[in-house]
């Protein structure tokens, strides 16, 4: 029944206590929009959600990280740091310890360089890999159409991302940079997402 469906718990729990207190977690079919100003730790945030203790990968979720802004090796390095509690300098100095600590989540995390790719490509990857969680870093750069109005571009890509989440029963986490209008504000809205 509809009442039973609304009582479903989220399949994947957040591992960040302050977030977990406000949001139960995520499940297939969810589109999660995450926005922040430049150089504020967006990639480290999703690395922590996925790879740190009790993160989605530790819970058994198959996670795909589609990176189109930073080099995929830099993104992967953040995940290694998050899962090992080691800086990259410490990882280089003790690769065997880093490998041992990263191993429990390594099979559940796949990285793909997505530079220049669009939402149709994202859908083909999701269809083939069948992930539980997809991270789009950065979501707006996957837009297949371009318009003078960034809201039109973002809306089309976000609708496609939402449809992917529903059709393939995965959670899609859409990372986005926020415009200067969002600087120092706590009351944010979708119009502040850059396209």
Residue ranges of each PLM-predicted region?
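Short gly/ser/thr-rich secondary-structure transition/capping motifs
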Residues: 12-17, 116-117, 187-191
């Amino acid at each position: 029944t509809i009442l039973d469906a609304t009582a479903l718990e989220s399949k994947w729990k957040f591992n960040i206590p302050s977030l977990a207190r406000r949001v139960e977690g995520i499940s297939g079919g969810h589109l999660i929009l995450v926005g922040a100003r430049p150089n504020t730790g967006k990639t480290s945030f999703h690395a922590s959600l996925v790879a740190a203790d009790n993160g989605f990968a530790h819970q058994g979720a198959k996670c795909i990280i589609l990176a189109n802004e930073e080099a995929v090796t830099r993104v992967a390095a953040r995940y290694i740091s998050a899962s090992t509690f080691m800086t990259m300098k410490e990882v280089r100095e003790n690769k065997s310890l880093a490998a041992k600590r990263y191993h429990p989540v390594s099979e559940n995390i796949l990285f793909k360089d997505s530079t220049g790719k669009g939402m149709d490509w994202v859908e083909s990857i999701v269809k083939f890999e069948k992930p539980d969680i997809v991270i789009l870093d950065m979501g707006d750069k996957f837009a297949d159409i371009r318009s003078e109005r960034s809201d039109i571009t973002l809306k089309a890509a976000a609708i496609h991302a939402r449809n992917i989440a529903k059709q393939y029963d995965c959670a899609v986490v859409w990372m986005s940079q926020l415009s200067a209008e969002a600087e120092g504000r706590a009351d944010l809205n979708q119009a502040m997402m850059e396209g």
